[in-house]
Amino acid sequence: MKFAKTLERTLEEDEIPQEWVEAAIQYKALKKCINKVVNELEFLGLQKNTLKILLNDKVVEVNEQETNPSNPIIAEYILSKTSTDAHNIKPMLKITLDYSSEDYTKDHIVELGKELKQKIEALLNDSDTEYEEDKIIELKEDDGGDLQIVTSREGSLSPPASRMASPPTSPTLKVVDSLNTNIDEALLSPDDHHKKHEIFIMLNSDSKFFEMLNDELNSLDTLTQQEESKIIEEVKKIAKYVNELKLKQSELYKWRELFKVYLDSEVYFKYNETALPSQQKSSEQIKSNLDLFVTNLNKSGIMTRFKKKQSLETFNQFMEMNYHLLKILQFQTINNEALRKILKKFDKQTSLGIQKTFPKLISNDHIFMSGSSLAQSICYIIQESIIKVIPQLDDYSCPICMNIAYKPIRLSCGHLFCVRCLVKMKQDDKTSCPLCRKENAILYADSSNLDLESMELMKKYFPREVKEKLRERDKERYNELRKNANSGEKCIVM
């Protein structure tokens, strides 16, 4: 299926809002613009295959002692900005006829000149043969839509500097009148002082193509900012309700269980990994994970235990926020694909090679093209504002017994353990940290290593676990006392 149809179908099936559709990459309109670029190039005699050969020839090996490339004919498509702060793209096709290399015989130069004669004959259309400024050819459409060639000197319309290093004494183009003078003589018999001729060609439709694409990226930037602001507001509302609900112990445990299922489903990220530069999940993966979360949530039966109206409303808002973010990511994905496809089609139709140069040139101009992904930034806010509001037991578990680390001892290396496990290790003459192996970390631990802040948090948010931990500790102590009591000699009645 053609991508244009796929794009239309996706926007319809995903129920994308109309204002989003209007801000999307207008793939069909850009395709029509590319066709006009092709027509203009062919109008100038620069067919796709011809340009492909010339553009491929622009990369040459240059020895350290050489100042001139060895290609006698070079074509280069240059994209630049109109100014440092501007976002507008100025495209220009540069054709260089370089006869300065001694590696090419006169016959070879004549052969190359004949091949290019018909292509550039219409470009060199100025009767003034005296000035020695570089030639700029610009295409314009007249009122009837027909193409016209407009020529100018470098002083009136300066081309951008070439990306290739120019020779120290590069001569300028000798301009000839293609209708009234002998172009063969000008092209095929370059004199000793003018061995490098440069022509800058400004098309009409490629400028419109980049202007249209830039406008659409601006629209996507605006939409992204608007939707990001909406989601952040949704997150704030949910965070406010969750903060209120966590004060009630019964609701606290329900929401902790709900968030545990959410984290285990890894909808957008792995817990505590949103700030890592890991590869972003595709929108298909996210949708699958979100569906998995809903399935696991139904299996757990958590929702049947939600009795308070506020809890149900907050949960519904939480789900709406997730699906809102998913829809934005799906929209971003299809637009990223549309941008990639349209740049690829531009190159396929014209051989001008913008797939790498254009994104690099505008990478800092658009939110859509730069910075961390929307999913990563929003998910970080979700984690910090909502998920971490209700602490997870895994964050306060002892790595040795895997139960809550009460009473918590923080060793000098920073790792947290329950005091009971550390006492056992010390009794077994194990004095290094079990995780990082820091020597004598357990040996030198004392009452000052008791993490009072974590202990208060555990009592507040994990009252059931703390109570169970104390019960297990007392039971263990009782068993130890019995064991010690039974280890002595038994009384024997004679």
Swiss-Prot record:
Gene3D superfamilies: Zinc/RING finger domain, C3HC4 (zinc finger). Residues 1-360 form the SPX domain. It is found in: Nucleus. GO terms for cellular component: nucleus. A zinc finger (RING-type) spans 398-437. One of its GO terms (biological process) is single-species biofilm formation on inanimate substrate. Induction: Expression is induced in biofilm. One of its GO terms (molecular function) is zinc ion binding. InterPro entries: SPX_dom, Znf_RING, Znf_RING/FYVE/PHD, Znf_RING_CS. Keywords: Cell adhesion, Metal-binding, Nucleus, Transcription, Transcription regulation, Zinc, Zinc-finger. Disruption phenotype: Decreases cell adherence to silicone substrate. It holds the Pfam family SPX. Signal peptide: none annotated. PANTHER family: RING FINGER PROTEIN 127 (PTHR23327), TRANSCRIPTIONAL REGULATOR OF YEAST FORM ADHERENCE 3 (PTHR23327:SF51). Transcription factor required for yeast cell adherence to silicone substrate. This is Transcriptional regulator of yeast form adherence 3. It comes from Candida albicans (strain SC5314 / ATCC MYA-2876) (Yeast). The lineage of its organism: Eukaryota, Fungi, Dikarya, Ascomycota, Saccharomycotina. The gene is TRY3.
